[in-house]
Amino acid sequence: EIGSGLVGSEMCIRDSHNTLIIRWQRREKYRMLDKVIENNRVCIIGEIVSEFTFSHEVFGEGFYIANVSVNRLSDMVDVIPLMISERLIDVTKDYRGMKIEVAGQFRSYNRHEGTKNKLVLSIFVRELRFLEDDEMPEEQSKSNQIFLDGYVCKPPIYRKTPLGREIADILVAVNRPYGKSDYIPCIAWGRNARFAGGLEVGAHLQVSGRVQSREYTKKIGEEEVERRVAYEVSVSKIDLVEDEE
């Protein structure tokens, strides 16, 4: 993990049009690290709906998981896991019901389950602040935003639903410092899906959208079905980047 002393901080702020953006306060010495970190930016505003549970420890620093409920434009909500350092917040307290604004990165890691690996995703929090009710954005589209700059690492899967809706699944690899990468599932719709369906492995993409949670069922036996939750990026904008030779 990157210690907080290596790079400048980032935070969610609003521009003159009251649009959420992420401000990156750079230090000249670490510009290359900043460039990598800028490949993966997420900002969400929501309500904490769980207590903290221990995840892991790195060099004596404990990291904990808490879930945040984020409203969609519809009546639905996304419940998104946050990965938070014990150095950012008192993880022994119960913050359920409190409104929070966080900025960070959407990260992944492989968790070994028997003979299989499971891709686990969460928002790695770099900055956070608690909000009063009157600070919550009126437009829900401004409470959940993500930007990714990465590469297609599996052939995209394009399909149509029984109702004729076009969908494409894209797995995007986003570079991280120290030779690591995050593998982020993305889902595109309509003309974005048609465009994504024709992309080749290795294509350089810039993706904007929101982080969403999606329930699904998985058959694990002849008669047994298990309910699971997937986390992915719902794509609103996708651009192909032409890399210089």
What kind of region is each of these model predictions?
Residues 1-16:
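Single conserved hydrophobic/aromatic residue that forms the stacking wall/gate
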